[in-house]
A protein has these predicted regions:
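Single conserved hydrophobic/aromatic residue that forms the stacking wall/gate
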Residues: 1-11
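Metallocofactor- and cofactor-centric catalytic cores in central/energy metabolism, strongly enriched
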Residues: 13-133
Length: 133
């Protein structure tokens, strides 16, 4: 079993991404805490959007977007594809300043992290962007 083999979408691109829309137009998301880590689930509003979402939401891109919450030394992002649900799971490690009652942050459980991620621009073909406006 290799999780990467369950995500065949990287070979499905047949059109060029020549427009950009915020992730919220393509997906819904929910976040919460796992100790000192935050979990963000991103679910495509349409299965056809998932390849574009996955192409854009690499761990490196999410680290750059969410750098303000990640521990500068130990913070990192892991990503998994969730087969059958047209979704991705992102784990932001060491993002909660200790988490729960140990954290001095305004959002110690990371409940607003999904809303922050939903603003990230996603490159899509123009015909998809036109459907969403």
């Amino acid at each position: 079993y290799t999780p990467r083999t369950l995500f065949p979408y990287t070979t499905l691109f047949r059109s060029r991404a020549d427009a950009s829309v915020p992730l919220v137009k393509l997906a819904v998301a929910r976040s919460g805490d796992k100790g000192n880590h935050s979990n963000i689930g991103v679910i495509a509003r349409d299965p056809a959007y998932l390849p574009w979402i996955a192409e854009a939401l690499t761990p490196e891109v999410v680290v750059d977007w969410m750098r303000h919450v990640l521990d500068p030394i130990h913070g990192r992002v892991e990503r998994w594809y969730l087969p059958g649900s047209h979704s991705l799971n992102l784990l932001l490690e060491n993002a909660l300043g200790g988490g729960g009652i140990a954290s001095l942050r305004i959002d110690p459980q990371g409940k607003a992290f999904a809303q922050q991620l939903l603003e990230i621009p996603i490159a899509v073909p123009q015909h998809i962007a036109d459907q969403l406006t």
